[in-house]
Amino acid sequence: MTYYELVITNIKIMSINNQLRELIKSGTFAGILLIIAFTLAIIVSNNIFLTKYYSSFIYSKFSLTIGNVRLQTTFIELVNDGLMTFFFLLIGLEMKFHLVEGEHKNKKKLILPAVAALGGVVVPVLIYMFFNYDKPRLIKGWAIPIATDTAFVLGILSFFSRHISLELRAFIIGFSLIDDAFALIILALFYTKTINTPALLISSVIIFILFILNYRQVKQLFYYIIVGLLLWISMVESGIQGTLCGAIIALFIPVNIKGEFNTSFKKLENLTSPFVNYFILPLFVFMNSGILLEYFAFKGTCSNSILALIYGIIFGLFVGKQLGIMLFSYPFVKFKLCNLPSDTSWLKFYSIAILGGIGFTLSLFIGSITFESSCPSNSMRAAVIIGSLISALFGVAVLKYCTGKE
């Protein structure tokens, strides 16, 4: 190889590396990983030779000992109830940063994302209840269609980055985070098992310790990690979803200390983000998306009543999300209580509302703690995937149409 060819080769390698970095930074890569994880789960769960290995992998049992506490669990439970804590930690960190230092420091700019998120919760719930109000076994799944998968939405929008203004991106992030906040509150209030009062009191004491750490403006992450681990154990023992402790910890880590930005806060967010987006979420999707293809044709449904569950989720995600976001947002903009993001038409805003119906990861998470028996669980997962897929395809089509005119 000549010197000239070597230089050209190095330039090409550097160009590829730069493109990969940009791909990872844009959020597209996280969305691609989720699609790959989902595809692999469908393939292995429907392959006669691989399905037994898949099942033995996700349901393999082992015990975890922390101090005097011994937890016996399966791998899928460890991911859903343990590792997903980091997902909620990241949500909490991003939420706090955007409120204190980010785009939504100006509270007026928070009005539109807040009302859009509220509409995106209320209407999907009403639609789900319309189909399942007379089915006591299925009505408890009402929170499944309220979620929006931020990683997927941002991944899709990265392909339209030239047409997405900074204000519109800020709206999308704000809407997604507030939507996640509603999901967290609903999980804490309505999806709690039998309460263990002594463990709940211990959790309260630990949360008070977090308050003291915040009040004293302690910035060392070590203390928050230790206290957070104790909080997770006590919350699991109390019957409350232990994963929620991630968001609680994030709320108590100070963003600013004595008027200066706390670099430890951003350091934790930077460490958590790739771990969550490139490992935990793909692993969660892989372990929770393995269902037989017959469920997508509704041939595997156990009874006609399960169809109500399926319709409630699909219509809740696809119709409920877009309808709720638009119905709640329009009056606020019309009466000048807030403004649409800059360079954003109502059609473009509508395309974002449709993409809000991509529930996927968080919808699967809520569904996994709602339905444990295989019949409703498999139908629930198929419905979440179908509803999210329809929302993604239709949202992209509308967004492509309106950006094509710009």
UniProtKB/Swiss-Prot annotation:
UniProt cross-references to HAMAP family, sorted A to Z: NhaA
Lipid bilayer topology: Multi-pass membrane protein
Gene designation: nhaA
Function text: Na(+)/H(+) antiporter that extrudes sodium in exchange for external protons.
Family, per entry: Belongs to the NhaA Na(+)/H(+) (TC 2.A.33) antiporter family.
GO molecular function, one term: sodium:proton antiporter activity
Statement: the UniProt record of this protein carries the keyword Lyase: no
Catalytic activity: Na(+)(in) + 2 H(+)(out) = Na(+)(out) + 2 H(+)(in)
Keyword Cell division carried by entry: no
An annotated GO cellular component: plasma membrane
Keywords attached to this entry: Antiport, Cell inner membrane, Cell membrane, Ion transport, Membrane, Sodium, Sodium transport, Transmembrane, Transmembrane helix, Transport
Compartment list: Cell inner membrane
Transmembrane segments: 29-49, 75-95, 111-131, 141-161, 170-190, 195-215, 220-240, 242-262, 278-298, 306-326, 349-369, 382-402
Domain of life: Bacteria
A GO BP annotation: regulation of pH
Record-given protein name: Na(+)/H(+) antiporter NhaA
NCBIfam families for the chain: NhaA (TIGR00773)
Cited Pfam families: Na_H_antiport_1 (PF06965)
Organism classification: Bacteria, Pseudomonadati, Pseudomonadota, Alphaproteobacteria, Rickettsiales
